[in-house]
Amino acid sequence: RSLPSTKNWTHAIYFRFVIADYFISKVAKVLYLDADIICQGTIEPLIKFSFPDDKVAMVVTEGQADWWEKRAHSLGVAGISKGYFNSGFLLINTAKWAAQQVSARAIAMLNEPEVIKKITHPDQDVLNMLLADKLIFADIKYNTQFSLNYQLKESFINPVTNNTIFIHYIGPTKPWHDWAWDYPVSQAFMEAKNASPWKNTALLKPN
């Protein structure tokens, strides 16, 4: 509870550290996904993937090169200029994660006042700081971010395509809200829900 949190990022964001540590010595790699991600394609390439010895994780970048440069400067880590990633998708090399003591070092950094002053996305920024130059960058299809609020705009570019594997529903509106289920991009979630044991569970209503 001593770690930084905000209204948008509760202490649940740090569960990815616990998950990674739990699977050390149990499996060679583990796939972490945020709870607001839905799968609409095969993950067989991830299952078959073998990490080179010097890489800790596979990730997907967000933003463009100019954004990466800004994050590298503000976080004080030059390697981030090669790619700043969203921590909602992490394919983790468990042996390397353990060898690098990523979880322990991240938690230690999150207790340092000087680090806290720099960060805006607590777990994500710290992981970018720790893992720069130790990453494999995957195609955006493995973490395609989309806010349902985009659909309120007169025009927008939908990044979700038939090739998208993981749709990451960012923003405050989620497909499990009862006012958002019928958006086209929500249908992947609805199909999964209707095929699940929770098919008869009501969608969330406004508070």
Name these PLM-found stretches:
Residues 27:
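Conserved PLP-enzyme active-site core in the AAT-like
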Residues 30:
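Short aromatic/hydrophobic "clamp" motif used to bind/position activated sugar donors
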Residues 33:
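Catalytic metal- and UDP-sugar-binding loop of GT-A-like glycosyltransferases, i.e.
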Residues 37-75:
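Conserved donor-nucleotide/metal-binding helix-loop-beta segment in metal-dependent transferases, i.e.
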Residues 78-89:
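A recurrent flexible, glycine/aromatic-enriched loop bordering the glycosyltransferase active site
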